[in-house]
Curated annotation (Swiss-Prot):
EC number: 3.5.4.2
UniProt subcellular location: Cytoplasm; Nucleus
Binding site for Zn(2+): H19, H21, H211, D291
Pfam family name, one: A_deaminase
Single Gene Ontology BP annotation: adenine catabolic process
Family of the protein in this entry: Belongs to the metallo-dependent hydrolases superfamily. Adenosine and AMP deaminases family. Adenine deaminase type 2 subfamily.
GO cellular component, one term: cytoplasm
Positions annotated as active site in the UniProt record: E214
Organism in which the protein naturally occurs: Aspergillus fumigatus (strain ATCC MYA-4609 / CBS 101355 / FGSC A1100 / Af293)
Protein's name according to its UniProt entry: Adenine deaminase
Function field: Catalyzes the hydrolytic deamination of adenine to hypoxanthine. Plays an important role in the purine salvage pathway and in nitrogen catabolism.
């Protein structure tokens, strides 16, 4: 529970989430439930004790040693998803939680390559997640966007085939998929491994983002920008390059910061080391997000509260964060105006009370 006096303000503050992986919302309970339903053999507890029980798995999530350590569990976790209904159920579970945390707009990543590699059709994944998005829009009043995310640990050829399949399915023009991103292992694979895909997508007007500057140094960020990304996911190591940070601020490039994820994956030792204050002072736009909440022990409100407890931000500083989150969302001007009005109303209410 958030200990900040601003908890009620933060809970009710209209939020936009830009960095959450739907596959990162598979809770330990859902992993065991779907494994039984779909007759999936989880790793043997004799050699992988974390899979002895729901409780053991959740406890292991608190002990990740690195990004790659987490990714091993992440990819095991998504292996239980087999049917369209599984993907829809997962998305719907996330949207319900996000809505309860005050999210009004959500842009969510999904990882088709990994599912394809285990024999799941692309259309099964997309149709399931799309159904979850539509239900959230219909029943919760959220606006949603799907971002197709390439993974850096698989060959570029598989990403190219996936991109061509999405194009052939007319998923970008029909707004089933609203953009492209990349994630997974940052350090190791070539920084520019998706250069040709991003060049093609940029030429077609497809929105681009990229995970960079989480474990990798600032050159990973500059490479992503060179390839056409207009949003950077994580990006906390941007502070190591003042010149690049000034460019990011000047060009209005938003970072999608995930504080609790950074702590769990040992990119920083504590939330206090996430450069929130430095970004605010430098005029760098950022949103605050949950990343893989089932694995990192917190959804978006938990991240907001952790930031508040670490930095003691003012209501007006939170207003800047919330408004930047809206203005840099992939939504039309009418929706932006609607959300900005909700933020203004909320701030005015709490400012008067204060």
């Amino acid at each position: 529970m958030c200990q900040s006096p601003l908890h009620d303000f933060l809970h009710g503050l209209p939020k936009c989430e830009h960095h959450v992986h739907l596959e990162g919302c598979v809770t330990p309970e859902l992993i065991f439930q779907l494994a039984e339903k779909n007759n999936i053999q989880l790793p043997n507890p004799a050699t992988h004790p974390a899979y002895a029980s729901v409780e053991a798995l959740r406890a292991r999530y608190a002990e990740f040693t690195s990004l790659n350590d987490f990714l091993d569990f992440y990819f095991h976790g998504m292996s239980v998803l087999h049917h369209q209904s599984d993907f829809e159920e997962l998305a719907w579970a996330y949207f319900q939680k996000a809505h309860a945390d005050g999210v009004h707009h959500a842009e969510v990543f999904f990882d088709p390559q990994v599912h394809q590699a285990r024999g799941i059709d692309y259309e099964t994944v997309v149709s399931g997640f799309t159904a979850g998005c539509k239900r959230a829009e219909r029943e919760l009043g959220l606006s949603t966007r799907l971002i197709l995310c390439f993974v850096r640990h698989l060959p570029v050829d598989s990403a190219t085939k996936l991109y061509e399949l999405a194009l052939a399915s007319n998923h970008f023009e029909s707004r089933v998929v609203h953009g492209l991103g990349w994630s997974s292992s940052e350090v190791g694979p070539p920084k520019d491994m998706f250069r040709e895909i991003y060049a093609s997508a940029s030429g077609k007007g497809i929105r681009l983002t990229a995970h960079a500057g989480e474990e990798g140094d600032p050159t990973y960020i500059s490479t992503a920008l060179e390839l056409g990304a207009r949003r950077i996911d994580h990006g906390i190591r941007l502070v190591e390059d003042p010149e690049l940070m000034e460019r990011v601020a000047r060009e209005g490039i938003m970072l999608t910061v995930c504080p609790l994820s950074n702590v769990r994956l040992r990119c920083v030792q504590s939330v206090e080391q996430v450069p929130i204050r430095k970004f605010l002072d430098a005029g760098v736009k950022f949103s605050i997000n949950s990343d893989d909440p089932a694995y990192f022990g917190g959804y978006i409100l938990d991240n907001y509260c952790a930031v508040q407890e670490a930095f003691q931000l003012s209501i007006l500083e939170w207003r800047v964060i919330a408004e930047n989150s809206v203005n840099e969302s992939w939504i039309d001007e009418a929706r932006k105006a609607e959300l900005l009005k909700r933020i203004d109303d909320h701030v005015q209410k709490h400012t008067v009370v204060a």
